[in-house]
UniProtKB/Swiss-Prot annotation:
The keyword Amino-acid biosynthesis applies. GO terms for biological process: arginine biosynthetic process via ornithine; L-arginine biosynthetic process. Keywords: Amino-acid biosynthesis, Arginine biosynthesis, Cytoplasm, Lyase. The gene is argH. This is Argininosuccinate lyase. It comes from Gluconobacter oxydans (strain 621H) (Gluconobacter suboxydans).
Length: 481
């Protein structure tokens, strides 16, 4: 959630007045910041979410400092104990965050020094907040990706499970939102499994690229201390240290790539949500959503509103906005670090929360929805949906060129339209008046079920294909129906 607008006359704003400069960096300053400077500069209101990653990074850094001789074993033990106590304080809600200390890094470091004294002040040796925050942020995004991957897999399992259940359930396939050809409901659901699989691949790729450790890059140029960057990288489960200190502390392409992947995934969820909204409407009547994912109206007692689906549909605007916002922040920044980069976290936190909610809501809707199969079957045969099957029959059985078959079928559709009937209701004589070679075998391909059964090409909607694909996905995802 975005911070409320700052009231420069409020107690919060004036709380900075008269304070000394930040004790972590204020040695060369004679006085503290202006009230509004304190407000705009502080990020603790949102970056405190990084506390677990910050403590984990500090523990790895401290262990490395002790190994290379920059901390004693006693100091390391004190730091570990102090950071453990601070983690407990934060976890239990007892930690008092100070906006005057700006961010989560300074808040934890100041509290550590308060608890254990000199050893706490040694922790920041060979480290800058620049490489510290870059490390924390990569750890946080990596953790977020892992969580979203699990959620996405769960949604894919739900879709594949329902697809297997409805492998042979006819429904209309649309182009231009006009009935085009029959498909199965299972085939339609599996289309989203494929999309989500690619979304998982993009997140997996983003995770692989971000998995390098900035710690040890210091402010921008590295450090003169004899540190072991590979030790800290390994301790934090990174693949390797970053190769260039300037790049490590200044770029946020890993966050942008993450937001880009989320934007694409949100687009896919938005498409599915839109279809759920349509399918649940009275004119379609394809599905009924459970009470758990619908709401009522304050004035119209009969209403059953698909609010969960509508909110998922809308989240794309928020997530894509976060992506474009951060892209705009980063586009003109010279090397190396600039305070602009503080604006990197809120978009990522916001987009992650939006995606987490969207996946959970969509998973629940898919599991709980009821398919109105009779209605789906009725609409699947509307709009001359088997016309393509007729054209294919002319090509296959009578060796008519496809363009000629297309023309003949179009004339037969026009004839049926004029009579107000389906293609299958035309008599053989009427069909032969357009194409004399047509025989009674044509009627075998004009049913919805025959159309579905014939689509046996790889990736097609034949029920046997759909059943096989659904079972294959469930096996890949580690669950059988």
């Amino acid at each position: 959630m975005k911070n409320a607008p700052v009231d420069t006359q409020s107690d919060a704003a004036t709380s900075f007045e008269g304070t000394a400069a930040n004790p972590q960096w204020g040695g060369r300053f004679a006085s503290g910041p202006a009230a509004i400077m304190g407000e705009i500069n502080a990020s603790i209101g949102f970056d405190k979410i990084l506390w677990r990653q910050d403590i984990r990074g500090s523990l790895a850094h401290a262990a490395m400092l002790q190994k290379v001789g920059l901390l004693t074993e006693t100091e390391l033990a004190e730091i570990r104990q102090g950071l453990g106590d601070i983690a407990q304080e934060i976890g239990e809600g007892r930690f008092e965050f100070s906006p005057a200390l700006e961010d989560i890094h300074m808040n934890i470091e100041a509290r550590l020094s308060e608890r254990i004294g000199e050893a706490g002040k040694r922790l920041h040796t060979a480290r800058s907040r620049n490489d510290q925050v870059a490390t924390d942020f990569r750890l946080w995004v990596r953790d977020a990706i892992d969580g979203l991957q699990e959620q996405t897999a769960s949604l894919m399992r739900s879709l594949a499970t329902r697809a297997l259940e409805h492998a042979a359930t006819p429904m209309p396939g649309f182009t231009h939102l006009q009935v085009a050809q029959p498909v199965t409901f299972g085939h339609h659901l599996l289309a989203y499994v494929e999309m989500l699989s690619r979304d998982r691949g993009r997140l997996r790729d983003a995770r692989a690229r971000l998995n390098e450790c900035p710690l040890g890059s210091a402010a921008l140029a590295g450090t003169s201390f004899p540190i072991d960057r590979r030790m800290t990288a390994a301790a934090l489960d990174f693949d390797r240290p970053t190769a260039n200190s300037l790049d490590a502390v200044s770029d946020r392409d890993f966050a942008l790539e993450f937001l880009s992947a989320l934007s694409l995934q949100a687009m896919h969820l938005s498409r599915l949500a839109e279809e759920i909204v349509m399918w649940a409407s009275a004119p379609f009547g394809f599905i009924t959503l459970s009470d758990a994912f619908t709401t009522g109206s304050s004035i119209m007692p009969q209403k059953r509103n698909p609010d969960a689906a509508e909110l998922v549909r809308a989240k794309i605007g928020r997530i894509m906005g976060d992506f474009v916002g951060l892209l705009t922040v980063m586009k003109g920044l010279p090397l190396a670090y600039a305070k602009d980069t503080q604006e990197d976290k809120e978009p990522v936190f916001d987009a992650t929360e939006a995606m987490t909610l969207s996946l959970a809501a969509m998973d629940g809707m898919i599991r709980d929805l009821k398919a109105n199969t009779t209605r789906m079957r009725a609409v699947a045969g509307m709009g001359f949906s088997t016309a393509t099957d007729l054209a294919d029959w002319l090509v296959r059985e009578l060796r008519v060129p496809f363009r000629t078959a297309h023309h003949v079928t179009g004339r037969l559709v026009g004839m049926a339209e004029q009579k107000g009937c389906d293609l299958a209701d035309l008599s053989l004589e009427e069909m032969q008046s357009v194409e004399p070679q047509i025989n009674a075998g044509v009627f075998d391909v004009l049913t919805v079920e025959a159309s579905l059964a014939s689509r046996t090409s790889e990736g097609g909607t034949a029920p046997a294909n759909v059943k096989h694909q659904a079972e294959s996905w469930l096996a890949k995802l580690g669950e059988t129906a």
